[in-house]
Curated annotation (Swiss-Prot):
The gene is HORMAD1. A motif (Nuclear localization signal) lies at residues 383-386. It comes from Macaca fascicularis (Crab-eating macaque). It holds the Pfam family HORMA. The modification Phosphoserine is found at residue 376. It is found in: Nucleus; Chromosome. This is HORMA domain-containing protein 1.
Length: 394
């Protein structure tokens, strides 16, 4: 039994490099971060069935990793897309991956939710500016700091995906790849992709923009952003967002300090995991988060071997993640276990579905937000930049 356990653990472990001193080690980390992020998002948003995922361990965290499955053509297709991303990433062409969710199979340009993964390649070696905007000091990025940031980013994604309102039952996926045009050959296309013909998208409803987090290595910067409908944020635990950002109106737009040269704008609702932990240390009973479905029983064994390099302690994780066994299972819920109460109108009549409300509000106000991922406000006519889209949608 002990031998079997020792043999199983290395096979199922998803290990981030303990030392990042070469560009190859950094590339391995960024690829794995992208894989874990996409897998976490698609799993907790219920896009693919359970059979499309395998179990892996990320230090003390049990995660589900997307895999090819003959019974799930969609997951197989997404894995192929990811391989195309890896090709562009390895060549240092890839600037941004946009994974978008849409509801009308005939209209993939009108999306309901999207996830942006941005990549930067640095030439400064191990010296880079990773301090806040108010502190311009440069400091060496240690492997320990990178690993902590990686674990923290994955945990932030978990928390957000658990608390967002559910997606419609039937959704489709598409992916757009954007490049650094100055170094990317005009005729380059990753495996499984073709030249895109529609750079912008139309967002259903009122979009909310969230900066989830980033990870820096001596050679790469990896950043994750999420755009979702405002109504999916209505039931989110407000303590997840930093107090400073909560006070800011939803309509207030702030410039993303890391991409000012691209003139991209995001609202100020950044996830603040550190603030959430501090509040729960003072008042542990205030947490209302459910336990991720990604955490299986074997994870309790892994927790006893927790690495000292983790960005948050075991006790903080326990305060952050609560059991969901006592929740009312008759209510609607997401795969993560988060329960959403059905709103009632006129005392006992359920309100119309969110999709019906969305269509009605769009008809009344004409609000369908056109979003260009790569346009500059300084240009009267936005410059068309090279991008790719899949040969086949999911």
């Amino acid at each position: 039994m002990a031998t079997a356990q020792l043999q199983r653990t290395p096979m199922s472990a998803l290990v981030f490099p303990n030392k990042i001193s070469t560009e190859h080690q950094s590339l391995v980390l960024v690829k794995r971060l992208l894989a874990v992020s996409v897998s976490c998002i698609t799993y907790l948003r219920g896009i693919f069935p359970e059979c499309a995922y395998g179990t892996r361990y990320l230090d003390d965290l049990c995660v589900k990793i997307l895999r090819e499955d003959k019974n799930c053509p969609g997951s197989t297709q997404l894995v192929k897309w990811m391989l195309g991303c890896y090709d562009a990433l390895q060549k240092k062409y890839l600037r941004m991956v946009v994974l978008a969710v849409y509801t009308n199979p005939e209209d993939p340009q009108t999306i309901s939710e999207c996830y942006q993964f941005k990549f930067k390649y640095t030439n400064n070696g191990p010296l880079m500016d990773f301090i806040s905007k108010n502190q311009s000091n440069e400091s060496s990025m240690s492997s320990t700091d990178t690993k902590k940031a990686s674990i923290l980013l994955i945990r932030k994604i978990y928390i957000l995906m658990q608390n967002l309102g559910p997606l419609p039952n039937d959704v489709c996926l598409t992916m757009k790849l954007f490049y650094y045009d100055e170094v990317t050959p005009p005729d380059y296309q990753p495996p499984g992709f073709k030249d895109g013909d529609c750079e912008g998208v139309i967002f259903e409803g009122e979009p909310m923009y969230l900066n989830v987090g980033e990870v820096s290595t001596p050679f790469h910067i990896f950043k994750v952003k999420v755009t979702t409908e405002r109504e999916r944020m209505e039931n989110i635990d407000s303590t997840i967002l930093s107090p400073k950002q909560i006070k800011t109106p939803f309509q207030k737009i702030l410039r993303d300090k890391d991409v000012e040269d691209e003139q991209e704008h995001y609202t100020s609702d950044d996830l603040d995991m550190e603030t959430k932990m501090e509040e729960q240390e003072k008042n542990p009973a205030s947490s209302e988060l459910g336990e991720p479905s990604l955490v299986c029983e074997e994870d309790e064994i892994m927790r006893s071997k927790e690495s000292p390099d983790l960005s948050i302690s075991h006790s903080q994780v326990e305060q952050l993640v609560n059991k969901t066994s006592e929740l009312d299972m008759s209510e609607s819920k997401t795969r993560s276990g988060k329960v959403f109460q059905n709103k009632m109108a006129n005392g006992n009549q359920p309100v119309k579905s969110s999709k019906e409300n969305r269509k009605r509000s769009q008809h009344e106000s004409g609000r369908r937000v056109l979003h260009h991922f790569d346009s500059s406000s300084q240009e009267s006519v936005p410059k068309r930049r090279k991008f790719s889209e899949p040969k086949e949608h999911i």
